Amino acid sequence: MKKTISFLMIAAMAMIVSVSFTACSSDSDTSGNVEAYQEIVDNQVKAQKASSKKTKALLLVAFGSTWPEPFTDFDNTIEAYKSAFPDHDVYFSFSSAICRNRAAAGEHVEDLNAPKRNYYAPDIWLESLGRVEYAEITVQSLQVIPGEEYASVVACLKGFANNTKNDLRNEYLKNVKLRMGTPLMADPDEDVENLATELHKIYSQYANQGAMLFMGHGNPDDLDIFSANIRYTQLEIALQKKNKNYYVGTVDMMDNFKTDVLERMREAGYNSGKVFCAPLMSIAGDHANNDMAGDDDDWKFNEETGEYEDTSWKVFFSETEKVKNGYDCSDETMIVKGLLSYPAIRQLWINHTHTALNSEPLEWYHSNDGTE
């Protein structure tokens, strides 16, 4: 049943993406060196496939980051996937051009001693995998919900399947087995409950002391392509069945900003005490370090959204004068760790990959020359 649900879910998402997204492209890389990047990745893939002799490839796709801790989380995730899928060559990609460019430039080399890293776009990796003609290619999204970023990943794979660069053999594309692993909370029932269970194991020590807040990303209403913002609400409900002190808010979801979380806390009678915060994101990058745990205190109120957009969660929940919160919320109550840093949660993504591999291949191929 899980296999069937997953297959139907991806098929439905693909139909939506075909209307909302027409392409996934590396053209937004500001350096203009797309051809050079393609050559670099081509050489890496050729060398890997020649060495391993494997016929199956697995491409992990994260949004990306420029912070050192996420780099470590990504490295550990790659190694975990290599161990879990020894018959696959494992590759890794950033979907964000901004993150790719900034990581390559070494945005945090001086202030955080972060290394320069070269990551490449999913469409470049897929093109290279196709050029050496892997018999099976599985793409695993490392997103938390099936939102805007996941849509771009689906668009990448659809573009590859339909030979948008028009340089792969139609006979190959007709026969290659393509699969897609869904985000962490794709399914509203099993996925949400599985994540709630693992989060409770990790964070119950904090929920037992005070309010335990998770900051997700979310999508603005006009970009909530798969109506997946509701996963955050569903997760809060699942978590509160385990401990009433859990709350789940977001950066971008309307009616679920930190101001909305505060309102729910007050309605529940939690008006003082400790407030712990952790990112509900695959890694702890800019949002976790700045929007959640930073010192931004602009206090400019957006009347349309009802949010203090440039005030961090830490500052907001510790404020005593402007909004009279006065909770015990400080550097000591910030838990700046991404979900991929926890092996048990990383395993949930791996489970999604197993589900994809046990599902029927996606039937997305349509040749450019009119033949099937």
Residue ranges and their predicted role:
Residues 9-17:
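Hydrophobic helical h-region of N-terminal Sec-dependent signal peptides
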